[in-house]
Amino acid sequence: MFTIDIILQMSPIPVSVQRKDEESAQSLYQSITQAMQEPNPKLIELTCDKQPDKKVAIFSNQISAVIVSEKTGAAAAGRAPGFLAIGEI
C-alpha cells in the first residue's frame, strides 16, 4: 500500500490517501504536482483505495508539499516516514 500525504498551507496535519500499487500512486503524485504548477487554482478531488468511502477535495493553490511513501515496517505502525518519534534517540 502506498500513501500520498498532502501538506496544506496553515495546517499541521497532512491529508492522506492510499493507493494499492506504485504506478497509481506515482500517477496521482504527478497529477497533483502538475496542478500545483498551474497559475490558476484547480479543485482536486481524491478518493482512497483503502477506505473507498473517504473523499476529499483540495484547492491546488493550498498545497505546500506532496509526499509518496510505501507503508511498510515502521510506517505501517503509524509513524510518519522520515521522522523520529519523541524519545527514540
Curated annotation (Swiss-Prot):
InterPro entries: UPF0367 (IPR020885). It comes from the Bacteria. Belongs to the UPF0367 family. This is UPF0367 protein PCC7424_2975.
